[in-house]
Every structure is written in C-alpha cells, then in structure tokens.
Amino acid sequence: MFKRARSIACLCIAATLSPPTLANTNSLELPDIGTAAGGTLTIDQELIYGDAYMRIIRSSQPIVNDPVLNQYIDTLGHRLVASANDVKTPFQFFMIRDRNINAFAFFGGYVALHSGLFLHAQSESELASVLAHEIAHVTQRHLARSMEDQARRSPATIAALAASVLLAIAAPEAGIAALTATTAGNMQSQINYTRSNEKEADRFGINTLAKAGFDVNAMPRFFGRLADEYRYASTPPPMLL
C-alpha cells in the first residue's frame, strides 16, 4: 500500500507477536478446510479463523480499552463499511497500544490500528483512508484468495497455508520464510499476486472513501508523507516495506 513503486505498500501487516505467542497457534483447534484439491474457503470458515487469531491477539497484545477511542474507531470504521461493496461479514475495529506505525486486517472482518498510526494521521480522512484500504482487503477476501492461489501451486493443505499467511501478517520475515518453504519456488508469483491485491484494495478503498464523504486525496497524501519520512530509516515501518 505504501511505496508507490510497490503499489502503495502493504497495510495488511499485523502487530509483532513473540515466538511463544506464535507457537500458541499450534494449540488452536482450527477447522479442517481441505487440501489443495479441496473447495473454496467459506465465509463461515473465515469467521472461525478470525476468531481464533483474535484470541491470540487478545492474550498477547496491549489492546486499547479506552471507551472513547474505541467508540470513535468503531463509528468511523462502520461509516466506511456502510459505503463499501461486497460486505459479507460483520466488522470489528480495535486499536493496539504500539507506537510503531502499522495497521492490519484478517479473517472475519477484524481490522486493527496501532496507536502510533492513529497519532500520525493529520486528519480524519487520512485515518479513514487506512481503514478503507483494510476493509477492502476483507471484502475482497484477499487472504482466502491468496491461500487458494497458493494451494493450487503446491501440495500443501489450505490449513497449512493459513498458518503461513497469518504468520506473514504477524511477523513478515518469518512469514515469508514459511511461505517460501510451503510454496517451493512460487514466491515470485505470490509477490505478484500480493501486489495485485494491494492495487485492488487501493481502488476499492478510494471508492469507499468517496462514497462515505471523505477526501479521496487523503490516501496518497498520507501514504506518501510516511514514505518520505521513513525513506532513509534503517528500520522503516513494516507497512512501508
């Protein structure tokens, strides 16, 4: 979503989880959703995965419990959802207390913002632009589509791919390594597929912004400002990579 050379670099990255937390995914009773030859991941299965991952986040991340902030984020998010296309799941918006600039969405309509990103936005439209992009990732089912695309390219089960994709959201470097092992040589096609998703999320996100009455120029302005600010940083925000 952010770097313009990479289709406005990804905002679909998540809060950094510690290795012990990631290990907890092994104990989750995730549904058996078939092999590469199986059917499409259903909405109900996405909801199960989303709830499971949210349990991990609740137990490991400092979620903001301020009722005023939570109400504001929820109201803003649902204003955008009301103007979005292809809404198939309920949405839940929340904030993680983390000064790092980050935002992410995952199965089941969960959308999170880091407090650092919230504080960095200079207008409501800029904040809304981030939420609109993440909402588009959910409505267009980018995680499920990415999993299914990879399942067609390898003998791994979709369930194994789910773990890799969720790991990629939580810890990009580890997730990329997992995806590399899982897809065995199909990484370039995965990168291209991700870029395609980002372009689609930009397009749907800007459309949602316009329909909801926000400034559509806020998205390129905010993302561009962040890219310029962290251009020479040794450790830029994950969402700018």
Q: Can you annotate each of these PLM segments?
A:
Residues 167-185:
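A structural motif
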Residues 24-170, 187-193, 200-240:
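Peri-catalytic and regulatory segments of divalent metal-dependent proteins
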Residues 1-9:
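Bacterial N-terminal signal peptides that target proteins for export
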